[in-house]
Structures are given as structure tokens and as C-alpha cells.
Amino acid sequence: MTKETFQVVSAYDGTKLDALCFLPEGKPKGIFQILHGMCEYKERYQPFMSFLAEHGYIAAAHDHRGHGNSVSDKSDLGYFSDKTGKAVTEDAFAVTQALKKRYGDLPIILFGHSMGSLVAMNYLQKHETAIEKLVICGMPKKNIFVGVGLFLNGVISLFKGERHRS
């Protein structure tokens, strides 16, 4: 098994996304693209990626913007973008395109964990023909207090700015 690292430049706004791949020995069966959860990073999935590569898959993961090595400065940690969550979904699609360009037109299996499962669901709605299969793991459940949290976040952002850490 071989490990490769590379960067993908986001088509959304030019953010550099740090990516890691584990390559199997021999001809790969497909590409298993991993979307990690909130406050995680790609290296956390290395044992799983190793397992996938041992079973014939290219295992790929990237750090979402604001996570791991996909930040230009420590102040970017935890910050997605000044717009919406659309950037994270489009980043995942840019990584898919880079993987296909790099390794050929192999079947893509998209795996999303926790927050990554929400990204994967958005991805499916916008780019359903780009993947062959979808695996959802640890999907968050509906929370009745989300509205309160969003309201409080908005109030705090008015006074302390969007990048304030609470």
C-alpha cells in the first residue's frame, strides 16, 4: 500500500484543500471518498483508509475548509466561509473531480460521517451522477433547539463578528 498527499484548489473560492490517499496494491476496485465530521481531520481516518486499501480500494480523504491542514492560518480553524455551507459541498465535488483526473474514471463511493453525512446528502442532491454509491454514518438527528442556537449565534456575530470563537 502507498500513501499520497496532494492539494486541491477549491473552485468555490480558491481555498487550498489538503488531501490524503491510500493506494492498494494492484488494480483498484474503486475510490472510497471520505467526508469527515465536525472538528475532525483526515488523518483520524487512517486506520479505516488502510483497511480499505488492503481490500482493493483507493481510500481518499481531505480536510474540509476550516479543518486540519486546509487552513491558511490558525484563525481559520473552525471557519467554513462567509457565505453558506455550499462551499463545503462544492469542495467535496472538486475533490471528486481531482480524484477522477488523478486515478481514472473509477466508481466513487462517497462516505460521510456526522457533519460529513450532511455534506454528503447535499452533495447527492447537486451531483448525484458523480458517485456510484453513498454511505451515511452517524447522521445527526433533528434537534428542537437548533433555532435557538442559530438565533444566539446571529446575535453574538453582530457584536463580535462571524469569526469569534465562543
Language-model region placement:
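N-terminal cap/lid segment of alpha/beta-hydrolase-fold proteins
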Residues: 1-26
